[in-house]
Each structure stands twice: as structure tokens, then as C-alpha cells.
């Protein structure tokens, strides 16, 4: 085994000496860095051709190894270790690599350029699966699986799972549109790729231990699934029936299965029978899934394997070793011990017989794996060819082949070794089939181009290798141009494919081989077209009936006809049921014998498999049996075929019904017309009609596509227009929003300006209020000085009333203090309406006061000291109380809403009328009382008031204000304390009432009529009656005030829910 050290080279040779034939390991690759440290390789993957593979190490270097050209080169340096690799199946120069930073990148191996970068995983990507069309890819991590579009490199879908369930693997099934997802709870789901609709779920086994699936593998035809995990058991699923068909137990040394890989074969049609199982001990064991036999293994305990990649064609296996190396294995060398012929037998040939009696040579073949024989000597066993007796010259001439070979000698060699040498097999076949090699005739056929029947061959028979696909199309097209029937035969690709694969480098030889096979070994196949050749099937059935009646009876009892157990073998020429080497060995014997040998081989295959066939009873089992490989010794089958050739009676022997071998004519190929021409012509016409319909359909579809493209374009334009309109609308809304914000800011600025104006007005009102208070204080001081002068003058003249006057003054001072406190408390609420109401009311009151003073000064000359002081105090208190009431009520009314003002206007007017009525009644009562007392004490007071007319005028004014207006004002104020609107109107009415009451005011101690302006009084007459009358009047006024206050409280409690409507107070 040659070890190639890559080192720091960017390109070089994979091996420097040609690998030794027979060695299983072609080369071992290692990369050493500085100081002899080995840089470990982590992952490998093959391309679609199978000739090249990528390998990534843990330094982030990715190398491309070309086995066919014996070259390697450094593709790129990523700088970080890769976790998964995969080729892009559509663009073969591109590949995907998952890196340790959880990203997936696409590179071009030729240009070494980054094509795209995909992100979205939050964990390390463990696997990359690419769809067979190359358009989609699935990347899998422990928590999510994501579906990518490789045309746009955009993520289409994402598979999320619960935290309790992890994802093991998600991958595409080959040659289908199905996604298979496997989870950590052993559940397996199948999904439709386009719609992600769940197609089915594989049922979990009801019995047996839980395997905990970790590894999965699918055959190339997508029909079988193998799964394994933490156990030595393998589960084989049939994806068509969705059932667990087999459980295989590996040897006891296997405890955990790390990786599973099917080994492809050229002639199995994708239904691989060999499965490689990589276990925890680092060995990969290859087994036959049908016979459950161990075929061979790679790796050992010393050189353990960590990962494996299998060539798509099944020729090579690349293994990543535990020590960081890469080993390249040859599958052909690994399986040559299985496929080599049995040891040479010593046969005694009598001189009378031309050939040895091969059916009498019996061998015991073991189905188990044979250990590789130890070499005893360096020479192979010598086989001595016995000379045959001389024959006639005519017979020798008949057996002479074009290449100078002798057919009898070739047959003898074949019977001795069982097969022709692989190196010379194609040469021997060309000689046996006497191929004419008509280059001109073949060129005339190929010049006609591809036949219309095989334009869509890749859809029905997809082949990974495009080269092989094109070769098959060319050969089939040439056959269809040679004979029209071959364009209608559906199974012709199955017949031609094995030969196309063998002669893919020489299409003409392949065509002539297939044509020779059809001309000789497919005789009478097309007489019942399009039905199978019933006459040929009957021949095989008669042979089986002659040699094994029990088996034929079993087939008849199960309802199985020859179309089911003979025709599958013939239409595929055994390529489905035999391996490549077995098929080549069989056709070595078929081409060396009469064309009837093929039918005898079918009968021999059926009879050699009699044991498993006798155990089958279902039609599906028989169909599966004759379409898949089985455990069969081909050597024994060939011997049985020879025995049937010699022991079958002449009346049953196919030789009598089939012509002898006839090679193709030289120069031009023979005419092939052994088929019902009318059927072929009818089918040709139908095919042409269908082709025309398809062309019409394609034309209409193209038109529809154009219309659809135009519709899509118009719809895109409309969407763009609406999107633009939407953007414009959004911009307009944004501009409106900006304008609204600006307006809101302007409104806020205006509100701030209004607040500043209100503050200035409030300050102005405060200044005016302070000025007014100073003026009132000055006026009070003047009045106090006047009162003081009056008190001193009266005290000198009225010694007897000192004590009573002092007591009255004290009471009035206490009351004045209380009223002053109340006035100050209420003045604070009436700041906003002082400039509108205060000045006007004050001016009117001042004018009226002056008029009253002037009139009273002329009419009155004096008054009694205690009565005058009481009247002045009461008048002052009343005036201050009225001003404070007006101010407070104005403030309260301004704070009410305008809507409440309109709703309560009627109630206010009613309250005004009632208040006016009460005030008028009270004024009338007081006026009557005043007239009555005036008449009684007129004579006594007249003399006492003469010296002080001005003093009496002040007392009369204050007394008149207090008696005529104070009680109604208090009642009205308490009755409307709930804050009714329209109070300003009430205030104006009160002011008018006050003026009227003041105009109609009559002094209580005046004996003259109201029109009189001057009257003389005396302080000496009727003092006792005046005192008692004054006390009674004050008592009545207090009682009336108490009643009005109680009624106002009741009205205020009711006004909290409804409009206050107080009842008039009776005088």
C-alpha cells in the first residue's frame, strides 16, 4: 500500500506508482504539517461521475482528488473546520460546505470563488442532502432542518421541532420528490417536497428493543430504507408498502451502528443488495441484505474507520481513518474473491467425446464468506488443456472465427474455467458474434438523429451518467431507424442497457451486438407484439414442466403464469437478478452456444430457485423475486442449463423451433421484418398523431405561457403602481402627521401664550385688588375716625348709655371680625371678576351712598349713640359681605361649563323671581315695621337727633342697607351655593333690587315722611320705647336670618342632583 503525503502541496499525484492489481487499498493519503504533525481529514464526498471526490481537513483546507487522472489539487482554504460536504448535482463545478460557524457556503472548484453564503442555523450542520434535480438542498442540524433553493440561495422552508425531540437526519429520496425526516424518538416521516404535505409515517415496531436510529441509507431506486443505531440490529423498510420487511442482526462485536451505505451495482437497476455497516469498532462490514451473509469488510481495530463515502458507480470506496488518513479502496478487488470461479477440476476426457460431461462434475459451494486463501506458492494452479481428437476439415472450417480463433477451443476453455478472461472478453464476444463492423451503414443510421420515441428516455429511465444516457439514446435510436418496431418496444432499453454500459466507448460495436442478440436470441419475440412472445414463454414452460413438475404445479396453483416468472428474465436478459460478473459469466456461455441456450438458462434459473419459490404464495412475492437479486450460484445454474440442453426431448427442445446463429451481413444490415407490420404502423401513426397533438399542446402551452408572462408582467406593473400609490399615500400621511404635529406645537404655544396672558391679567387683578384694599382700608380708617369722634361726642352727652354702648360695640366688633375673616376667605375666589363687577358695583354703591348721605344729612340731625354704632357696624359688615359674596359667586360661575349655564337658565330665572319676591316681601315687612316704630317714637327721637345730622345720616344709611338687603342676600347666597349658572344675571337683579331697596329705604327712627329731607329729633323723648323696639327688631332680623340660612342649606343639598329652586320666605 502506497502512502502519499500531501503536505503543503497545492497539487500533485495521488499515487506515484500504479497500484498493484488485486490489492484492495489503491492508495493511502495523509497530510503532515510542520514538525511532523498529522492534519486530520474529517469529511469526504464524491461527485456525480464518481471519478472525483472532495476531502476537508480540520484546518479548513478542501482538496479535490481525481482518481481517474491520478491528480489532486487544493481547492480553497476556509480557515475553519468543515462539518459537511456535498456536490451541487446541477452545476457540477459547484459544491456546498458547512463550516464550524454554522454557515453554509457554495464554492466553485474550478474558479475557487465564493458563489454564495447561507446562514440560518444555530448549531453545527451535520448533513447536506441535494435533490436529484440539483435545485434544492436540505441542511440538517440537531435542532432544525432548512430547505434551500440553490438557484437563488434563499431559504424556502424551515423545520422546527420540540426541544424534547431532536433531528437525526433529513434527506431527499433518490429519483423522487419526497423528503424523509428521521427524529431521535425513532419516528420517520415522508414529506412532499413542493407542498411539504406529510405523505406517510413509517410505523414503529411494536416489539423488540428500541434501537435509537442514528444511521440511514436508501437504495438508488428509492424503494428500500436501512436504519440502525445503538444496537446490532438493522431494520430494512420497504418504502412502497411502508412496512418493516426484515430485521438483520449483526455479529455480537457490533454494539452501535455509525454509518450505513448501499453499494451500487451496474446491473441491479438501483435495487442495491449489498449494504455496508460501519460500527463502533471502526470496521465496515458489507452484507447481502437478502441472504444476510457477510461478504467482506474493510478497516480493522488498528486502522479504524470514522466515515465512508461510496462511489456512485460502485467502483471505489473512500474511508476517513481514525488516524486522519484517507484510504481509497477498489470494490472490484474487494469482491474478486467472491466472483472468481471455483477451483479448477481435473476432468478425464475420453477420445470419443468432444467435450467433457460437465453436468456430471458436481461441486459443493458454500454460501458463507470464504476467507482469502493463503498463498502457498507464487504460481497459479496450472490447468492442462487436453488435446481433442482431430475432426474433419469441414468442421474445422465451420468453427473458424473471423479473428482467427476456433470456436471449439473457446468452448472448451469456457467449460474448463466457467468464463472467458476479463481482459479478452470483449474480443472473444466480437469473434463469437462475427460482428461485421459496418461503419457506413451505422453512420447512415446515426445521421438520422435521435428517434422521436427516445427523446424523453431520461424521464422514464433516469441515469446519473449523462454520457451513458446519451450513448443509450443513440443506440436505441439507431435500432429504431433500422426497424420501425424497435421504436415501439417498451422493454428495449432494458435489453440494450447492459451492452451499452459494456461498450459505451464504441457505439457501433454496441449497436451490432444488440442487433445480433435481437436477430438470434430474440427470435419470434415480436410475432405477438405488443404482447409478450407467448410461444417462447410456452417453450420455457414446457422445459420446466418436463424437469420439475412439482414446481410448475405450484406456480399454476398460485395463479402464476409464464409472463410473470419467465418474461421478466428475458426482457431484462437477467440484468436485474444477477450481478455484473455473474451476468458476464452467463453471457459468455449464451454467446458460445445455440440461441436456445438462453431459454434453457431461464428454465435453469427457475428450477435452481425452486426452494424459495415453493415458499412463495402471493403474487407480490413472485414479482419481487423475479425483479431482484437472489441467493443463487450462477455456476450451478449454468450447469443445469447445459444439462437441460442435453437431456430435454427433441419435441420439447427449443432448438427445433429456433434457427441457428446467423451473424449480421457485411456492408448493409439485414432487413428485420419479423413482426406484425400493421400494428407497428398503427402505433406509428398513433405516435405521430400524439406527437402532433403534443406539439399543438406545447404551442398552446407556449402561448399560454406568453399570456401568463404578460399577465404576470401586467400584474407586476399593477402591483408596482399600487405599491407606489401606497408609498405616496404613506408619504402624504407622514406629511399630514408632520403638519398635525406642527399644528399641535402651535396650539401648545398658543396655550402657553394664553396662560401667560392669564397670568398677566391675574397679576393685574392682584394689583387692582391690592389698590382697592388700600383704598378700603383708608376709607375704613376715615370712617373709624368719624365713628370715634361720634362716640366721644355721644359719650359726653349720654353718660347713662356708656355701659350698653360698650357692650354693643364689643358684640359688633366680634361680629365684624368674624365677617372680616369670612370676607377675606371669600375674596380670594373672586379675583377674575373684580375688574368687571367690583368696580361697577363699588361705583354704584358709592354713588348711592353719597346720595343717601346727602339726603339723610339734610333730613336727620343725629341719632342715639348705641343705635348709630350698631347701624354703622351692621351696614359695613353687610356691604363687605355683599362684595365678598359677589366676588365668590362670580368666580364659581366662571368655572362652570357653558352647557350647564344654558340648561339651568330656566331654574335660575325661577330662582330669581322667587328671590325677588322674598326680598320684596322682606322689604315691605321691614318698611311697615319701620313706619310703625317711626310713628311711635317720632316725637322722642326728633329732639335727640338734631345736633348730629351727618352722624344720623350714616347710621340711617347703614341701618337701611342692613335691614333692606342683607337678609335676602344671605338667603340667596346660601340657596345657590351649588354653583348654578347664570348667577351673574341674578347678581345684576340683586344689584337692581339693592338699588331699589336703597331708594325706598326709610329710616327707622325718622318721624318725618320719606320725602322730607330734614327733620329735627330729640334724644330725650321715648328712649325706653326706642330701646325696646330696637331690640325686638334685631331679634326678628336674627330669627329671619336663621330661617333663611336653614332653608338655603336644604336647597343646597337638593341642588347637587337637580337645579336649585328655593321656595319664597314668608315675611
Swiss-Prot record:
<keyword id="KW-0966">Cell projection</keyword>
<dbReference type="GO" id="GO:0036064">
    <property type="term" value="C:ciliary basal body"/>
</dbReference>
<feature type="region of interest" description="Disordered">
    <location>
        <begin position="1045"/>
        <end position="1067"/>
    </location>
</feature>
<dbReference type="GO" id="GO:0060271">
    <property type="term" value="P:cilium assembly"/>
</dbReference>
<keyword id="KW-0677">Repeat</keyword>
<feature type="compositionally biased region" description="Basic and acidic residues">
    <location>
        <begin position="926"/>
        <end position="937"/>
    </location>
</feature>
<dbReference type="GO" id="GO:0005813">
    <property type="term" value="C:centrosome"/>
</dbReference>
<keyword id="KW-0206">Cytoskeleton</keyword>
<dbReference type="InterPro" id="IPR000195">
    <property type="entry name" value="Rab-GAP-TBC_dom"/>
</dbReference>
<feature type="compositionally biased region" description="Basic and acidic residues">
    <location>
        <begin position="896"/>
        <end position="912"/>
    </location>
</feature>
<dbReference type="InterPro" id="IPR036322">
    <property type="entry name" value="WD40_repeat_dom_sf"/>
</dbReference>
<dbReference type="InterPro" id="IPR015943">
    <property type="entry name" value="WD40/YVTN_repeat-like_dom_sf"/>
</dbReference>
<feature type="compositionally biased region" description="Polar residues">
    <location>
        <begin position="941"/>
        <end position="953"/>
    </location>
</feature>
<keyword id="KW-0175">Coiled coil</keyword>
<dbReference type="Pfam" id="PF00566">
    <property type="entry name" value="RabGAP-TBC"/>
</dbReference>
<feature type="coiled-coil region">
    <location>
        <begin position="724"/>
        <end position="773"/>
    </location>
</feature>
<comment type="function">
    <text>Molecular adapter which is involved in cilium biogenesis. Part of a functional complex including OFD1 a centriolar protein involved in cilium assembly. Could regulate the cAMP-dependent phosphorylation of OFD1, and its subsequent ubiquitination by PJA2 which ultimately leads to its proteasomal degradation.</text>
</comment>
<dbReference type="InterPro" id="IPR001680">
    <property type="entry name" value="WD40_rpt"/>
</dbReference>
<keyword id="KW-0963">Cytoplasm</keyword>
<feature type="repeat" description="WD 3">
    <location>
        <begin position="162"/>
        <end position="201"/>
    </location>
</feature>
<dbReference type="InterPro" id="IPR051570">
    <property type="entry name" value="TBC1_cilium_biogenesis"/>
</dbReference>
<feature type="compositionally biased region" description="Polar residues">
    <location>
        <begin position="1052"/>
        <end position="1067"/>
    </location>
</feature>
<feature type="repeat" description="WD 3">
    <location>
        <begin position="120"/>
        <end position="161"/>
    </location>
</feature>
<feature type="repeat" description="WD 2">
    <location>
        <begin position="76"/>
        <end position="119"/>
    </location>
</feature>
<feature type="repeat" description="WD 4">
    <location>
        <begin position="202"/>
        <end position="249"/>
    </location>
</feature>
<dbReference type="GO" id="GO:0060090">
    <property type="term" value="F:molecular adaptor activity"/>
</dbReference>
<feature type="repeat" description="WD 4">
    <location>
        <begin position="250"/>
        <end position="288"/>
    </location>
</feature>
<keyword id="KW-0853">WD repeat</keyword>
<protein>
    <recommendedName>
        <fullName>TBC1 domain family member 31</fullName>
    </recommendedName>
</protein>
<dbReference type="InterPro" id="IPR035969">
    <property type="entry name" value="Rab-GAP_TBC_sf"/>
</dbReference>
<dbReference type="GO" id="GO:0034451">
    <property type="term" value="C:centriolar satellite"/>
</dbReference>
<feature type="region of interest" description="Disordered">
    <location>
        <begin position="896"/>
        <end position="955"/>
    </location>
</feature>
<dbReference type="GO" id="GO:0005737">
    <property type="term" value="C:cytoplasm"/>
</dbReference>
<feature type="repeat" description="WD 1">
    <location>
        <begin position="36"/>
        <end position="75"/>
    </location>
</feature>
<keyword id="KW-0970">Cilium biogenesis/degradation</keyword>
<dbReference type="Pfam" id="PF00400">
    <property type="entry name" value="WD40"/>
</dbReference>
<feature type="domain" description="Rab-GAP TBC">
    <location>
        <begin position="419"/>
        <end position="594"/>
    </location>
</feature>
Amino acid at each position: 500500500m502506497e502512502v502519499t503525503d500531501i503536505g503543503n502541496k497545492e497539487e500533485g499525484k495521488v499515487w506515484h506508482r500504479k497500484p498493484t492489481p488485486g490489492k484492495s487499498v489503491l492508495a493511502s493519503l495523509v497530510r503532515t504539517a510542520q514538525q511532523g504533525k498529522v492534519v486530520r481529514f474529517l469529511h469526504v464526498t464524491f461527485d456525480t461521475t464518481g471519478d472525483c471526490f472532495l476531502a476537508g481537513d480540520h484546518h479548513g483546507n478542501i482538496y479535490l482528488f481525481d482518481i481517474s487522472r491520478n491528480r489532486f489539487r487544493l481547492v480553497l482554504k476556509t480557515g475553519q473546520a468543515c462539518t459537511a460536504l456535498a456536490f451541487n448535482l446541477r452545476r457540477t463545478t459547484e459544491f456546498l460546505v458547512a463550516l464550524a460557524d454554522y454557515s453554509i457556503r457554495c464554492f466553485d472548484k474550478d474558479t475557487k470563488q465564493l458563489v454564495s453564503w447561507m446562514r440560518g442555523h444555530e448549531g453545527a450542520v451535520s448533513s447536506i442532502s441535494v435533490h436529484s434535480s440539483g435545485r434544492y438542498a436540505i441542511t440538517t442540524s440537531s435542532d432544525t432542518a432548512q430547505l434551500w433553493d440553490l438557484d437563488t440561495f434563499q431559504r424556502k422552508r424551515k423545520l422546527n421541532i420540540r426541544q424534547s425531540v431532536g433531528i437525526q437526519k433529513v434527506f431527499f429520496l433518490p429519483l423522487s420528490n419526497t423528503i424523509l425526516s428521521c427524529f431521535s424518538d425513532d419516528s420517520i416521516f415522508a414529506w412532499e417536497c413542493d407542498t411539504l404535505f406529510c405523505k406517510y409515517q413509517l410505523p414503529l415496531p411494536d416489539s423488540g428493543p428500541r434501537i435509537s436510529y442514528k444511521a440511514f441509507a436508501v437504495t438508488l431506486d428509492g424503494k428500500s430504507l436501512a436504519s440502525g443505531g445503538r444496537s446490532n440490529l438493522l431494520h430494512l423498510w420497504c418504502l412502497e408498502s411502508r412496512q418493516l420487511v426484515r430485521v438483520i442482526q449483526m455479529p455480537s462485536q457490533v454494539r452501535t451502528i455509525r454509518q450505513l451505505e448501499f453499494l451500487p451495482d451496474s446491473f441491479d437497476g438501483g435495487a442495491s443488495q449489498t449494504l455496508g455497516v460501519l460500527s463502533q469498532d471502526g470496521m465496515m462490514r458489507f452484507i447481502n441484505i437478502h441472504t444476510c451473509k457477510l461478504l467482506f469488510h474493510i478497516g480493522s481495530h488498528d486502522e479504524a474507520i470514522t466515515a465512508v463515502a461510496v462511489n456512485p458507480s460502485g467502483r471505489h470506496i473512500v474511508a476517513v481513518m481514525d488516524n486522519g488518513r484517507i484510504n481509497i479502496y477498489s470494490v472490484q478487488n474487494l469482491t474478486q474473491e467472491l466472483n472468481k470461479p471455483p477451483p479448477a477440476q481435473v476432468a478425464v476426457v475420453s477420445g470419443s467425446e468432444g467435450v467433457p460431461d460437465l453436468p456430471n462434475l458436481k461441486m459443493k459451494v458454500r454460501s458463507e464468506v470464504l476467507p482469502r486463501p493463503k498463498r502457498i506458492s507464487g504460481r497459479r494452479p496450472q490447468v492442462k488443456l487436453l488435446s481433442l481428437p482431430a475432426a474433419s476439415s469441414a468442421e474445422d472450417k465451420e468453427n473458424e472465427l473471423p479473428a482467427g480463433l476456433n470456436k471449439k477451443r473457446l468452448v472448451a476453455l469456457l467449460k474448463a474455467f466457467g468464463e472467458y478472461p476479463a481482459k479478452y472478453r470483449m474480443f472473444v464476444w466480437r469473434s463469437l458474434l462475427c460482428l461485421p463492423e459496418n461503419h457506413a451503414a451505422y453512420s447512415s443510421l446515426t445521421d438520422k438523429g435521435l428517434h422521436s420515441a427516445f427523446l424523453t428516455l431520461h424521464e422514464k429511465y433516469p441515469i446519473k451518467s449523462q454520457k451513458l444516457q446519451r450513448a443509450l439514446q443513440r443506440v436505441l435510436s439507431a435500432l429504431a431507424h433500422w426497424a420501425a418496431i424497435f421504436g415501439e418496444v417498451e422493454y428495449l432499453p432494458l435489453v440494450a442497457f447492459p451492452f451499452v454500459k459494456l461498450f459505451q466507448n464504441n457505439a457501433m460495436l454496441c449497436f451490432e451486438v444488440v442487433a445480433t442478440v435481437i436477430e438470434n436470441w430474440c427470435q419470434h419475440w415480436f410475432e405477438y407484439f405488443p404482447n409478450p412472445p407467448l410461444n417462447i414463454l410456452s417453450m420455457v414452460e414446457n422445459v420446466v414442466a418436463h424437469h420439475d413438475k412439482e414446481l410448475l404445479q405450484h406456480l399454476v396453483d398460485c395463479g402464476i403464469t409464464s409472463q410473470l416468472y419467465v418474461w421478466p428474465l428475458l426482457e431484462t436478459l437477467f440484468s436485474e437478478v444477477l450481478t455484473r460478473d455473474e451476468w458476464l459469466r452467463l453471457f459468455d456461455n449464451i454467446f458460445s452456444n445455440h440461441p436456445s441456450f438462453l431459454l434453457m438458462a431461464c428454465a435453469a434459473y427457475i428450477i435452481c430457485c425452486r426452494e424459495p419459490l415453493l415458499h412463495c404464495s402471493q403474487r407480490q412475492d413472485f414479482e419481487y423475486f423475479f425483479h431482484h437479486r437472489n441467493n443463487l450460484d450462477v455456476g450451478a445454474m449454468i450447469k443445469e442449463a447445459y444439462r437441460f440442453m442435453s437431456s430435454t426431448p427433441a419435441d420439447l427442445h427449443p432448438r427445433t423451433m429456433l434457427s441457428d446463429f446467423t451473424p449480421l451481413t457485411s456492408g448493409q444490415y439485414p432487413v428485420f421484418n419479423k413482426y406484425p407490420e400493421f400494428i407497428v404502423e398503427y402505433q406509428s401513426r398513433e405516435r405521430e398523431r400524439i406527437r402532433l397533438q403534443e406539439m399543438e399542446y406545447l404551442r398552446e402551452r407556449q402561448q399560454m405561457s406568453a399570456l401568463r408572462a404578460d399577465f404576470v408582467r401586467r400584474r407586476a406593473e399593477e402591483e408596482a403602481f399600487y405599491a407606489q400609490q401606497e408609498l405616496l399615500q404613506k408619504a402624504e400621511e407622514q406629511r399630514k402627521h408632520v403638519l398635525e404635529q406642527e399644528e399641535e406645537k402651535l396650539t401648545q404655544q398658543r396655550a402657553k401664550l394664553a396662560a401667560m396672558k392669564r397670568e398677566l391679567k391675574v397679576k393685574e387683578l392682584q394689583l387692582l385688588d391690592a389698590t382697592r384694599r388700600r383704598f378700603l382700608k383708608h376709607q375704613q380708617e376715615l370712617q373709624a375716625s368719624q365713628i370715634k369722634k361720634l362716640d366721644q361726642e355721644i359719650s359726653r352727652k349720654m353718660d347713662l348709655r356708656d355701659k350698653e354702648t360698650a357692650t354693643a360695640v364689643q358684640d359688633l366688633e366680634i361680629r365684624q371680625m368674624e365677617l372680616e375673616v369670612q370676607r377675606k376667605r371669600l375674596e380670594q375666589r373672586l379675583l377674575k371678576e373684580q375688574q368687571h363687577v367690583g368696580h361697577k358695583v363699588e361705583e354704584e354703591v358709592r354713588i348711592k351712598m353719597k346720595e343717601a348721605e346727602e339726603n339723610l344729612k339734610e333730613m336727620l340731625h343725629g341719632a342715639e349713640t348705641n343705635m348709630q354704632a350698631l347701624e354703622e357696624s351692621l351696614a359695613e359688615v353687610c356691604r363687605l359681605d355683599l362684595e365678598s359674596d359677589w366676588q365668590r359667586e362670580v368666580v364659581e360661575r366662571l368655572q362652570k361649563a357653558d352647557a350647564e349655564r344654558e340648561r339651568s337658565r330656566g331654574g335660575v330665572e325661577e330662582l330669581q323671581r322667587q328671590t325677588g319676591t322674598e326680598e320684596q316681601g322682606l322689604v315691605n315687612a321691614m318698611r311697615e315695621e319701620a313706619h310703625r316704630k317711626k310713628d311711635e317714637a317720632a316725637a322722642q327721637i326728633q329732639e335727640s337727633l338734631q345736633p348730629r345730622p351727618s352722624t344720623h345720616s350714616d347710621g340711617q344709611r347703614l341701618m337701611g342697607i342692613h335691614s333692606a338687603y342683607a337678609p335676602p342676600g344671605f338667603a340667596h347666597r346660601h340657596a345657590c351655593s351649588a354653583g348654578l349658572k347664570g348667577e351673574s344675571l341674578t347678581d345684576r337683579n340683586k344689584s337692581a333690587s339693592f338699588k331699589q331697596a336703597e331708594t325706598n329705604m326709610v329710616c327707622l327712627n325718622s318721624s318725618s315722611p320719606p320725602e322730607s329731607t330734614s327733620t329735627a329729633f330729640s334724644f330725650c323723648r321715648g328712649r325706653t320705647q326706642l330701646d325696646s323696639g330696637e331690640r325686638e327688631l334685631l331679634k326678628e332680623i336674627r330669627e329671619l336670618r336663621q330661617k333663611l340660612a336653614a332653608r338655603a342649606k336644604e336647597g343646597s343639598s337638593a341642588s347637587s342632583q337637580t337645579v336649585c329652586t328655593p321656595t319664597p320666605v314668608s315675611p
